[in-house]
Design a protein with these regions (language model features):
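N-terminal small/glycine-rich loop or linker at the start of catalytic domains
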Residues: 1-4, 72-83, 231-233
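Histidine-acidic metal/acid-base catalytic patches
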Residues: 1-29, 107, 135, 160, ...
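Active-site-proximal loop/turn and secondary-structure-junction residues that shape catalytic pockets
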Residues: 9-11, 34-36, 79-81, 115-119, ...
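Active-site acidic/histidine proton-transfer and metal-coordination neighborhood
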Residues: 17, 59-68, 80-185, 195, ...
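Short beta-strand segments at enzyme active-site cores
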Residues: 30-33, 72-76, 109-115, 147-152, ...
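Short, flexible/disordered intra-domain loops and linkers
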Residues: 40-52, 158-167, 277-283
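Glycine-/proline-rich flexible loop or hinge segments
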Residues: 41-48, 76-84
Length: 300
């Protein structure tokens, strides 16, 4: 298993600088953020402009990675592919296709996204809509030698307060979509499952046939706040770097391996204690790498 990180934690820095940080901190892989340059929401970045990438640009990026001994585990564009507004949905789906095209140029086999949610429809209707939308998107990706994967953040409050903005955030929803779109992969993130009360270790073991990528992000329950703040509200938990929260990482990694996954563990840095100035962000990534690296098997 190799360690990487999602580059969305460094939105203001160019890819060349991100690569330098990765090699200095001991990472081997990068999950490269590919949101549009005009993106406005948090936890996003545009380290590859997929709208303008051509073969020459792809060759330059491949060379940068190779010179530093790194590889790209996936391209990342996590947005609402089921947006209720047809124009917004067309833009999101179109950018996802461009991200797939970029992956093909770069020789990258995975592109990550969210399913999203159309809040004008029922959950059952959304599953059927997702099957249609992702049936077309996975076919587009497959024709280009790329596999789409979905991540399981519920995105509560993304479109409406107290409401999940991402349809497929737990095993029950995964089952419904994978039954309809079997070529879709899963980028499993245990941090969301933990605060939702879903067993992340069982999910890692039981969904090995679908897991193609894994995020490393921890969760800390703020118990004094939770004594006053109900489950449906926020502020009673927060994301942390691996090892600074409550997840049992040896157990999670073992469950992944037992389920048949042994590829990339990609740190998603959303730790508020280690955000802000570049040296704080870098420090968080270094802490995560130092904690996770001893837990992984490194063949001689």
């Amino acid at each position: 298993m190799k360690l990487g990180f999602l580059t969305a934690c460094m939105p203001e820095r160019p890819l060349s600088e991100v690569v330098h940080v990765a090699t200095t901190a001991g990472y081997q892989m990068l999950e490269v953020a590919c949101w549009p340059r005009s993106g406005e929401r948090d936890h996003h970045a545009s380290h590859i402009d997929v709208a303008t990438l051509d073969e020459a640009g792809a060759r330059e990026i491949r060379g940068l990675m190779e010179r530093q001994g790194l590889a790209i585990s996936a391209l990342a564009y996590y947005e609402n592919n089921l947006a209720a507004d047809p124009n917004e949905r067309a833009v999101v789906n179109g950018h996802l296709r461009k991200t797939v095209d970029a992956a093909q140029l770069l020789g990258v086999g995975l592109v990550g996204t969210f399913v999203g949610n159309d809040l004008s429809k029922t959950p059952t209707e959304n599953v059927e809509e997702a099957a249609t939308v992702f049936g077309e998107l996975t076919a587009y990706a497959g024709e280009r030698g790329v596999r789409l994967m979905i991540e399981n953040c519920p995105m509560v409050g993304w479109q409406r307060p107290y409401t999940p903005g991402n349809l497929c955030y737990a095993p029950a929803q995964w089952d419904a979509l994978f039954a309809r779109v079997p070529d879709l992969g899963l980028n499993i993130d245990p941090s969301h499952l933990y605060w939702l009360g879903v067993d992340p270790y069982a999910a890692a073991r039981d969904y090995g046939a679908h897991i193609v990528h894994a995020h490393a992000k921890d969760t800390e329950i703020l118990h004094q706040r939770h004594a006053r703040i109900p489950v449906l509200d926020d502020g009673w938990w927060r994301y942390r770097m691996p090892g600074l929260g409550e997840l049992n990482w040896p157990r999670f990694i073992s469950a992944l391996q037992e389920g048949g996954y042994d590829d990339v563990l990609s740190t998603e840095h959303e730790d508020p204690v280690w955000e802000g100035a570049p040296d704080r962000v870098d420090g968080g990534l270094i802490l995560g790498q130092r904690f996770l690296a001893p837990l992984l098997y490194h063949p001689s």
